[in-house]
Amino acid sequence: MDKPYSTIGSRMAGLNETWLAKTREPILEPELTVIDPHHHLWDFPEHRYLLQDILADTGSGHDICQTVFLECTAFYRAAGPEAEKPIGEVEFVNGQAAMSASGQYGTTRIATGIVGLADLRLGARVEQVLEKQIAVGGGRFKGIRFVASFDNMEPQIHNGHTNPTATTYQDDVRFHEGFAVLGKLGLTFDAWVYHTGIPTLTALARKFSDQPIVLDHCGGPLGLGYWASRRDEVLTSWRRDIRELARCENVMIKLGGLGMRVNGFDFHKRERPPTSEELAAAWRPYIETCIEAFGPKRAMFESNFPVDKLSGSYAVYWNAFKRLAAGASADEKAQLFRETARSFYRLPRLYGPNRESRQ
């Protein structure tokens, strides 16, 4: 398939670190150990976010023990078959992860899990690509994300970098053929749709009921442009579709990703970044609905950095998540902040001051 992907880099603008520093807070529950199951690494002309950058964020006060990298069209191979170019991203991230695992850069282990991209629309032929990604992943390669975010109502909203249709998850026969290979190889699947596409994921999850799936970013409730004046309508339809999706026991959900422009909260337009109280208040209807629908054992908080860094700092974000989980028990917090992610991605258990790895 000729050039099946667009690049994310053209959509990223440099972040304003001076602005982000205007809101600082004491760290809440600093003793709570956290796995961040969703962040990116890249070096685009518009913005750089590599190992030292993520470590600066994870080292800002919360006890982040390990992280999971999600594909973002970074460091693709420059030559070779088009279908195999995303293998370069796995090679790059495995190198960053190996640097982190050396212990030279602190105790947080970056990218103990790697989620890459392969074009599942290749059908059964995608197995060759997946096997090569597993081979170069150093034991860290966990699965695939193939985004199907699609909106034709608001010109400011970009469709997914995989160039999907509105119903790729639901009725693309070649995609389904490739999707079936994930189970054969024991790989996970990250899904990303806007709220209008949640029913297509529900259809996919029902068709492949044994495939572990996690929906990113609370299912993408839109609030930009056309959707800005329809927030109540969006919340109602989103809530209905999230509850229906949660009936699929093979599906989990990531709690976060609400600080992007498409969500329409516009925190990035303010003179000062929001406090964790303000973030928690804005996000509560979405986060609480997800936790109620899926339960703590099928829900995990995520940073989605540096994309969500548009709206606030890493320290403030995790403070907001802790505020949102304030009523949870210790066991429920362990699930939401750590164990659900560890189980889904088959991550190592890390012990001691040097984060010794034990399976």
Walk through the language-model features, giving the residues of each.
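Histidine-centered catalytic micro-motifs
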Residues: T33-F44, L215-C218
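Short, well-ordered coil/turn segments that N-cap beta-strands
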Residues: P30-T33, H62-Q66, G106-G113, G137-K142, ...
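Active-site gating/metal-coordination segments in enzymes
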Residues: K3-K22, P81-G197, A203-R206, G219, ...
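Catalytic metal-binding/acid-base residues of hydrolase active sites
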Residues: H40, T73, D119, V147-S149, ...
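Catalytic pocket-lining loop regions of alpha/beta-barrel enzymes
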Residues: P4-S6, S10-M12, T165-M300, S311, ...
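Conserved, mostly hydrophobic/aromatic
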Residues: H38, T67, V93, I114, ...
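Mid-to-C-terminal alpha-helical segments outside catalytic/metal-binding sites
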Residues: M1-T33, Y49-D57, C65-Q66, P285-T289, ...
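Alpha-helical scaffold segments that flank or form the walls of functional sites
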Residues: F44-R109
